[in-house]
Amino acid sequence: MRLEKCWFCSSTIYPGHGIQFVRNDAKIFRFCRSKCHKNFKMKRNPRKVKWTKAFRAAHGKDMTKDTTFEFEKKRNRPERYDRNVTENTLMAIKKIAKIRTAREAKHIENRLKPNKQKKLNDDMKELDQNIHMVQAPGAQKIKVDVSEKKSVQNEAMEE
């Protein structure tokens, strides 16, 4: 089964899905959905559209340079079937997937770390400025006795 990549968003296109556009110079553009095709016709740059993989790679949102990506290269050379090689390949795929998920999690954690510290500093600054609004959890509530002057005024209003 041949899986293609969308020209605009780089997502996988399965057989029987998507649309294909062939330019006069025989350049083939494949699109996964009409959203990508419309954006292409509007001459939008995929690196500037926030939901595309090109944007995420260009702005450091996703992991782009990693040794685990080299295993996914397309190879057009047919190889003779060997059960042992196939078994080893399938085991290697599982190990690589596990390594990649761990590295992606670490990448996300490192990417969010500076903002986490900045948010903590901003929260501490706001707390220092508005400390008078915070009540101590161990403080007892003060009960205020209402004087009878108000009740006399209420009776006068009722009449």
Swiss-Prot record:
SMART domains: TRASH (SM00746)
Domain of life: Eukaryota
Extent of the signal sequence: none
GO cellular component terms listed in the entry, alphabetical order: cytosolic large ribosomal subunit; nucleolus
Principal place of residence: nucleus
Function: Involved in the biogenesis of the 60S ribosomal subunit. Ensures the docking of NOG1 to pre-60S particles.
Protein's name in the database: Probable ribosome biogenesis protein RLP24
Organism placement in taxonomy: Eukaryota, Viridiplantae, Streptophyta, Embryophyta, Tracheophyta
Encoding gene, per UniProt annotation: RPL24C
